[in-house]
């Protein structure tokens, strides 16, 4: 069953954006996260936080990816906070437009 991940990283938004850009470029240069089960990926910012919002094939796949040492190392090597510091919410996906 598909799920939606919402991960909130608190901090200086300008610094988080720059670190996100570096980390995202590195992840994409390695083939992205579709092989890990990510179907869609979005990044948004708000007052004092950066959000990563993704649609994943299953809760198990997102938890496996976000708990992996390799993923943590990629993020932190680019100056992005460890996924362990994120406030994470995983929700059952009810609907998506356009459909998956």
Please annotate each region the language model reported.
Residues 1-51, 55-69, 81-100:
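Short S/T/G/P-rich N-terminal loop/turn motif that feeds into the first structured element of a domain
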Residues 72-78:
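Low-complexity, intrinsically disordered Gly/Pro/Thr-rich segments
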């Amino acid at each position: 069953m598909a799920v939606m991940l919402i991960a909130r990283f608190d901090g200086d938004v300008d610094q988080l954006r720059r670190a996100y850009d570096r980390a995202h470029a590195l992840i994409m240069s390695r083939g992205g996260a579709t092989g890990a089960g990510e179907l869609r990926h979005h990044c948004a910012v708000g007052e004092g936080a950066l959000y990563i919002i993704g649609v994943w094939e299953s809760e198990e796949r997102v938890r496996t990816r976000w708990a992996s040492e390799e993923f943590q190392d990629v993020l932190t090597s680019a100056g992005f906070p460890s996924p362990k510091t994120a406030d994470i919410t995983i929700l059952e996906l009810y609907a998506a437009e356009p459909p998956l």
